Amino acid sequence: MLVCGVDEAGRGSLVGPLVIAGVAIKRNRMRELKSMGVRDSKKLTRKARESLYPEIVNMADSYHISRVPPGVVDRSVGRHMLNDLEARYMARVITRLGHGTTYVDSCDVNPRRFGGRVSEMSGRTVRSYHRADDRFVIVSAASILAKVARDRSIERLRKSHDVGSGYPSDRRTVGFVRGYYNKNGAMPPFVRRSWRPARLIEAGG
């Protein structure tokens, strides 16, 4: 019997995509996942995540990674529907994984409501929890896939742009966005214009 986990990475990022990853693995292999050292990606070093990524992929019965472009994120933020966007993409990922109970990390203050949305959209049994990436090893595995995929997206950008970590708390990131805007009179296509730092820069702040 399969168990599925879904998580995101880059939700708060100013630069780059929102990444949704899902993985399906046989229930009787959950202990094996734990013994490999799989846990919440935020508690692992980048080197550890990169090392675990191929191991998780090789163990998985199926997995899927979806990248939501900044422009799509911006349109959802403009309609105050970022949670709905995440639910929709999670549902799409779930339908690619095969049948099995799916655990998701809730971005909604009400996990039951969020799980209900994802379940309705995917037609699958979905259990939604806060901190699911810390509570369920299958979601931890998904969080590692999402985080590595997001980091690789940023690395590709770094080859031609000094974007830093991509997060708005990073002065290097904000400095790059401001410098690019001042030079070109427009935001880079990989920046979320709906995020406060970008709006302030466009407003002359």
From Swiss-Prot:
Residues at which a divalent metal cation binds: D7, E8, D105
Q: Where does it live in the cell?
A: Cytoplasm
Q: Name one GO biological process term.
A: mismatch repair
* Chief place of localization: cytoplasm
**Residues in RNase H type-2 domain copies:** 1-205
List the Pfam families: RNase_HII (PF01351)
The free-text cofactor remark is:
Manganese or magnesium. Binds 1 divalent metal ion per monomer in the absence of substrate. May bind a second metal ion after substrate binding.
* EC number(s) from the headed UniProt entry: 3.1.26.4
Please provide one cellular component term from the Gene Ontology annotations of this protein.
cytoplasm
What the entry lists under PROSITE patterns is as follows: RNASE_H_2
Q: Which cofactors does this gene product need?
A: Mn(2+); Mg(2+)
Gene Ontology molecular function, alphabetical: manganese ion binding; RNA binding; RNA-DNA hybrid ribonuclease activity
Does the entry feature the keyword Hydrolase, yes or no? yes
Coiled-coil positions are none
**Primary role:** Endonuclease that specifically degrades the RNA of RNA-DNA hybrids.
The text of the family note is:
Belongs to the RNase HII family.
Q: What is this protein identified as?
A: Ribonuclease HII
